[in-house]
Every structure is written in C-alpha cells, then in structure tokens.
Amino acid sequence: MLEDKATRYTPVPLDEFCENRVRRLQELKEELLRELPSTSQSVDGYITIKGATEIINKLKNTIVKAKARIYVSATDSAIEALRGELTEAVGRGLKVVIITGRPFVLEGAIIYYAHKPNSQIRLIADSQEVLTGDLADGSNSTCLYSSKQNLVDLFKDALKNE
C-alpha cells in the first residue's frame, strides 16, 4: 500500500493573491487608525522630507487632502507623476493651476508654460500648505514642507513671477 503525501501548497492566481494582500493592508490601516492616538493636524514648524519617493508621496497626499486650490510648478516628469491626483482634484471641483516646461494637457486645469531647466518643485495647497524642493538626487532629494503663513505667502508671490 502506498501513501500519497497531501499537497501542502498550491499557488493561488496572482490576482487573488494581490487582492488578499490589499485586503489585509486595508484591515491593518483600519486597526492602526483605531488604535493609534490622534495627532495635531497643523504643522507649526518646517519639516524636511528626504527621498524622491517620499516627496512624491507627500505631494500626492497634499493634493488629495486639498479642499479648494492647488498651485504646482514642476518639470513635466514630476507633473506626470502627479497626473492621477491632479485629475481627481479637478474632478472634485478644485482650482488647479500648473506651471510646467513642456506641453501638458489636463481638462479643467489652468496650465502655464515656463522654462523649467532644473528639477525644482513647488506646491501650494489651499493657501495654507507649501512644499518646495528638488527631485534631482533620487533618494538624496530633499523638500521643505510647512504651513507657516509667511512661507506660504512668499511662495505665492514667487509663483506669480514664474
């Protein structure tokens, strides 16, 4: 008599595997939001963000949380990385103003073209938050984030002159 070993592992389809992981991450997010203490929403000082990926994530999150206006000045590649969030912002009825170096089309947004020789990026959200920095150095890129009104006003003037 031969005993056959039972199969202990059978790969699931990739789509099912991904759905399981996304579902688990969503559950973990909800648990963290329930369990972690709430934090103050306002940032009184200045925060330095390091790394291109982290900077892009902060830009995207700021756009998603905006309630009225977004002003962004960046190279075409940076604007392209933000396309989904900018499109969604226009869809929510936000005023979206983009200053970039190459032709870029986004229905409902106001777009200006200016010479953008470097990888500087500037974003103002709701006249309350500002992000400014450089994306040229990959993981060594840095960005300054603040909700200090004097810095927001300074960058509003700077964007008017671009």
Give the location of each predicted region.
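Generic beta-strand structural signal
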Residues: T7, A68, Q120-I121
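Short beta-strand
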Residues: M1-L2, A114
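C-terminal regulatory/effector modules of DNA-binding transcriptional regulators
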Residues: A78-E162
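PLD-like (HKD) phosphodiesterase/transphosphatidyltransferase domain
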Residues: D15-E88
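Minor-groove-contacting beta-hairpin "wing" of winged helix-turn-helix DNA-binding domains
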Residues: L2-V12
